[in-house]
Structure formats: C-alpha cells, structure tokens
Amino acid sequence: MGQNDKAARRQKIKLRSKTRGQGTAASPRLCVFRSVSQIYAQLVDDVNGATLLAVSSMAKENKELKGTKTEVSHTIGKQIGEKALAQGITKVIFDRNGFRYHGRVKALAEGAREAGLVF
C-alpha cells in the first residue's frame, strides 16, 4: 500500500466518521491527530464550532517528557482527561481522525480513560 493510498483511506474514514458523531458542549468530540513525531488531542464542540481544550506533546509543559512515543501519548491522554474533568466534562465522543485504533492512538485513549473520561 503506497503513501497516497494510505492518505486517501484515512481521509475517507475521517469523513465517514465525522457524519456519525458530532460533539456538543456536554459531550464534546475528543479529536486525535498523530504526526510522525508528535501527538495532539483536543476537545471540540461542533455545535458552537469551538475548541474547548487542547493538549499536545509540543506544549511547553510537555517538552521534557521522556520515553517512547507511545508512553508520551499515554501521558497526553491522562493530561487531557484530567483537564476535562476539571472543566466538568466526563463524557466524550472519541474521534480517531481516520487513524487505526492501535499504538499511540490506543495509548492516548487508554490514558484518557484512566483519568476518568467515558467513551
């Protein structure tokens, strides 16, 4: 499978999943983006078109995180879960953004669940 095939497959899955679940203020969408070296997670309210919360491995407080990319992703998941609970958000819709539920995406989801988010 070539690089263009993978990108096209991801875009197709991304569009298909966006029509299924829209986030609200009470139950926002936990959107995950994974690059080659970094991972990003944000809580999105699709009704109002607003990002409620964002955490990434690029943030200043996360620059010193050590370990593998999967371990860092798990930590990012815990952080977004703790920050969401501090804002009173307990239930989210998980949007893997076309990425397979494996590796870093799975680690982020498990970290968020450990912190107390329900999805």
From Swiss-Prot:
Superkingdom of origin organism: Bacteria
Basic residues: compositionally biased ranges: 9-19
Annotated GO MF terms: 5S rRNA binding; structural constituent of ribosome
GO CC annotations, alphabetized: cytosolic large ribosomal subunit
Matching InterPro entries: Ribosomal_uL18_bac-type, Ribosomal_uL18_bac/euk
Keyword RNA-binding: yes
Signal peptide: none
Any single GO BP term: translation
Alphabetical list of Gene3D superfamilies matching this protein: 3.30.420.100
One Pfam entry name: Ribosomal_L18p
Keywords: Ribonucleoprotein, Ribosomal protein, RNA-binding, rRNA-binding
Keyword Iron-sulfur: no
Region (Disordered), start-end ranges: 1-26
Assembly notes: Part of the 50S ribosomal subunit; part of the 5S rRNA/L5/L18/L25 subcomplex. Contacts the 5S and 23S rRNAs.
PANTHER family xrefs: 39S RIBOSOMAL PROTEIN L18, MITOCHONDRIAL, LARGE RIBOSOMAL SUBUNIT PROTEIN UL18M
Protein family according to the UniProt entry: Belongs to the universal ribosomal protein uL18 family.
Name of the molecule in the record: Large ribosomal subunit protein uL18
